[in-house]
Structure formats: structure tokens, C-alpha cells
Amino acid sequence: MKQTIGLLFIFLLWGNFCRAEIRIMPLGDSITEGGYEKRPGFPTTEGSYRTSLVPRLLSLNSKLSFVGSREAGPTALAQKRHEGHSGWRVDELIAGRVYARSYERGIRSWLPTYNPDIILLMIGTNDILQNYFIDQAPLRFQKLIDEIQRLTPRATILIASAIPTNNDHLNAEIEKYNSEIHSFVLSQRSQGASIYWVDMYNEAKMSWRKGDFSDGVHPSALGYLKMADVWFNHVAPFVSASLLRASLRE
């Protein structure tokens, strides 16, 4: 009898495991959104790093679903959903953004709606570009993470450092910001939080001189390929591990 119950439990667990869908939310600004290559004759960047990352992850696990309120990418991209918002700062991801005639909500709307299992977060570039109380940007980032954890306590958060620009002064500010964010992530990890560091700035090795940018800020198609490689290396190990956790959540 006990053996029968045990086998039944395994069967039911395996059934849930097979049905589990892992929801991934790319979250950030225009670098996550993509599509800012304006030079004639250059490959499009529509879909950003997602154009290369999505099919590679789907080849590992077909039960992945990219989620978000926005949709962008080339026709060949099977899943185009994301939360990349052009010009947005850290604080705006929390509170939303007021436009001349409209208001767009932030994570307090998106996260409960899409309930992601994995969040790919890259944000902070616009805080520096807009010179928006830069010294307080790391504190705003901590508040953002606190809110994400409150709204989606089961989610795994992968945090990418901000990438360089073609301006040395801005890069110095970006490096300082990245360093403080990294320290925060390490502190969170020591407390058992499901939060991980992706050193995009150094691992992607992107440079204006190498043709990795379409302008002073946004990656070119080549730059996005490098970003996709880094994301893939960090996300792939979580895909299968998250499957079981998602099945238990159902």
C-alpha cells in the first residue's frame, strides 16, 4: 500500500513537472527593448539581446514563456514579450511614469499580472545619463529589489550591471554604480535571497571601438549578440532548476 501511494505521488509530481511553464521577464529600459539602430545598412537591433537569447533558451527547455506587457522583435522571434521601457530610471520601474497625456504603470502592475519565475533585470543607465541624483541611485535600486521581492517572493532575480557608453566620464559613474549594486547583491545572497549578479559590463567586453554600439549608449547587433551570450551563460543553469520549483507551486 505504501509503495502504491509512493508511486502515485511520484506520478503526480512528474505530471506537474512535465506541465510546468517557466515565465521569464526581461525588465529594464531601452537596452532591453531594442530597436535603436538608426544607421543605414546596419543590421536591425529590434528585439535587443532577446532575439538571440530566446531561441537558445527554448532549445534547452520548450516550456519557457517570456512575459511582459510589451511586445517587440523581428518576425522570426517566437516570443517577443518584455518590460523594456525607453528612458526609464530605477525609480520609474517602481512608481511608473507620467507622460504628457498618460500614465504608465510599473512593476506593481506588471509583476502581479505576469508572476515571473525568473527576472532579467538591467536598469540604471538613464539615472546616470539624466544626472538624476546619481549618488542616490544605488539606494533607489535597493528599494526596487525590495519591491520586486515583496511582489514576487518566489522569483529568481538575475541582475546585470549597466554596460559602458562612449563617454569616459559617464563610464566612471557607471562603474561606481555597478560596484555598489554588486555589493548589495552579495549582501542579499549572504542572507539567502534568490538574487544573482551578472557582470555584463566586464563579461560582454563591449566597446565602441569594436563596433558594439549603434550610438553612444545602445548596442549594435554585434553588441547584443555579446549580451545574449552572457545572459545565456547565467540563465541556462536556472531553467531546469526552476522547472521543479514551478511544478510545486501549481
What are these regions (language model features)?
Residues R23-M25:
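Conserved beta-strand elements of the Class I
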Residues T32, Y36, V54, L58-S59, ...:
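Sec-exported extracytoplasmic/periplasmic mature domains
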Residues L27-I31, V67-A72, L121-N126, A160-T165, ...:
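Active-site-proximal beta-strand/loop segments in catalytic clefts of secreted hydrolases
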Residues R81-S86, I163-R245:
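Catalytic His-Asp segment of secreted/periplasmic serine-dependent ester chemistry enzymes
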Residues T4-W14:
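Sec-dependent N-terminal signal peptides
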Residues C18-A20:
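Boundary at the C-terminal end of the N-terminal hydrophobic targeting segment
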Residues G34-L139, L170-S179:
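Conserved SGNH/GDSL esterase-like catalytic core that processes O-acyl groups on lipids
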Residues M122-L129, I145-Y177, Y201-A204:
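Active-site segments of SGNH/GDSL-like serine hydrolases
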